[in-house]
Design a protein with these regions (language model features):
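P-loop/Walker A NTP-binding module and the surrounding RecA-like catalytic core of P-loop NTPases
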Residues: 92-95, 100-313
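Non-catalytic terminal/linker segments enriched in charged/polar, low-complexity residues
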Residues: 1-100, 106-113, 130, 134-139, ...
């Protein structure tokens, strides 16, 4: 089942969820466009400030401004109001997700999911399991976050809800051993995707690096043919702090995608643009609520349209 058939209403929830971000960024852009009678350096400087203050980040903002200046010059645009569509296009171009980004869905694969406690990591694993199951995939979950007492129970609940198998360990068990058992179970059950929930103890990078290193070694020796995906889960409400976390995780793991949770009700949704630009890693999923359907593949057109509220379904 191709996920372009998004459940009706997701766009509306996205528009609603991005209200605070819209108030934070778009209202400033609108007043800028109506407040200037012509395009000059002051106009660009003020636009730059609005975008940076809206959590789009310095690198993405500079790239957007440069792109806009080039297009304005090429198209001989004089009126600020005529820039809005070009600005929207420039922001979309910062966040394009390649079709190959979801290759793991179509091959026998292992998806490591990392993230600090409280960002919605375990919930994301559960929702992903549900989405893959809906697509007809056979899924196994490995509960390798054995350091957090509630993680195993929470994951078990999600596994039951999604109707998928889970391999876990007792609190404090060796995460590597859990992954080893989960690989064996995946092979025995001919699973399409093994989702691994890992501990996100960023405050002790050395431990985390060792743990991920051990998991990777097990996967390389026991499951060498499996396609590998590593997703980092970030809480959009933390804004620039999410970017800092992403950078730190990229020091210890080869991150291939980002999941941004809690996009509903944050004024810092612009971080979705900043992260992709700063790290050259795509945002692959965004979450705007509690249910399985509230986690969806990231679509830059849809996101920016929802941000600017430029179309409705």
């Amino acid at each position: 089942m191709e996920e372009k058939e998004k459940k009706p209403g997701f766009f509306k929830r996205l528009v609603s969820g991005l209200t605070k971000t819209r108030d934070n960024i778009v209202s400033g852009i609108d007043s800028l466009f109506s407040g200037f009678s012509h395009i000059d350096d002051d106009f660009y400087e003020e636009l730059e400030e609005i975008l940076i203050m809206g959590d789009l980040g310095v690198r993405a903002t500079e790239s957007i401004i440069e792109d806009l200046q080039r297009k304005v010059k090429e198209q001989h645009i004089k009126e600020p109001a005529e820039c809005k569509e070009l600005l929207i296009e420039s922001i979309k171009e910062q966040m394009k997700v390649e079709e190959t980004a979801y290759r793991f869905e179509n091959e026998k694969s292992v998806v490591l999911v990392i993230g600090v406690n409280g960002v919605g990591k375990t919930t994301t694993v559960g929702k992903l399991a549900g989405k893959l199951k809906e697509q007809g995939k056979k899924v196994v979950i490995a509960g390798a976050d054995t350091f957090r007492a509630a993680a195993g129970d929470q994951l078990k609940e999600w596994a039951n809800r999604a109707g998928v198998d889970m391999i876990g360990g007792a609190e404090g068990a060796d995460p590597g051993a859990v992954v080893y058992d989960a690989v064996a179970a995946s092979k025995a059950r001919n699973a399409d995707v093994l989702l691994v929930d890992t501990a996100g103890r960023l405050h002790n990078k050395e431990n985390l690096m060792n743990e991920l290193g051990k998991i990777n070694k097990i996967l390389e020796s026991e499951y060498p043919d499996a396609y590998r995906e590593t997703l980092v889960v970030l809480d959009a409400t933390t804004g620039q702090n999410a970017l800092v976390q992403a950078r730190e995780f990229s020091d210890v793991a080869k991150i291939s995608g980002i999941v941004l949770t809690k996009m509903d009700g944050t004024a810092k949704g612009g971080i979705a643009v900043a992260i992709q630009s700063e790290l050259s890693v795509p945002v692959k999923y965004i979450g705007v609520g509690e249910t399985i359907d509230d986690l969806q593949k990231f679509d830059s057109d849809e996101f920016v349209n929802a941000l600017f509220d430029t179309k409705t379904e």
